[in-house]
Amino acid sequence: VERKQPDLVLIVARSFATKLATPTLITDARGDLVYFNDAAAELLGRSYLDIGELPVSRWQELFEPRTLDEEPLTPEQTPSGIALLERRPAHGSFAFRGLDGRDHEITVTAFPLLSRPDEVVGVMSIFWEPPAGP
């Protein structure tokens, strides 16, 4: 099986993400997880070096994304899925379980990564846990 070289836009996005203190993850044009930074690792419960790249079905299974009302979310319903499928930025909140067993509620802003105006090569998702209420 021949593996396609990553698009330059994904390479630059990964380089940018490594420098951010905000949790950031990158998916490719299929929705597969191709990178997340150290800040994201703190919420996800494992480092990128431990996990590596994951197909969309596997990372959905591992992290169990769900609405804040505990309803399961499909990949297409998450901000990153919306950004990929609709080729537009998306913002929202949802919950997931980290690989360390801790549950998190996060707010996410995701935007498509374009190599040309008509070609989405991936999505960058920046997320954070909102501060606890009073």
Which residues make up each language-model segment?
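PAS and PAS-like sensory/regulatory domains
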Residues: 92, 99, 104-108
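N-terminal capping loop/helix in small sensory signaling domains highlighted by a polar->aromatic N-x2-3-F motif
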Residues: 37-41
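Flexible loop/coil segments at beta-strand boundaries within sensory signal-transduction domains
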Residues: 98-102, 114-119
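PAS-family sensory domains
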Residues: 79, 97, 108-111, 118-130
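Conserved hydrophobic beta-strand signature of PAS-family and PAS-like sensory domains
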Residues: 33-34
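Terminal output helix/cap of sensory domains in signal transduction proteins
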Residues: 12, 51-98
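Sensory modules in modular signal-transduction proteins
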Residues: 4-29
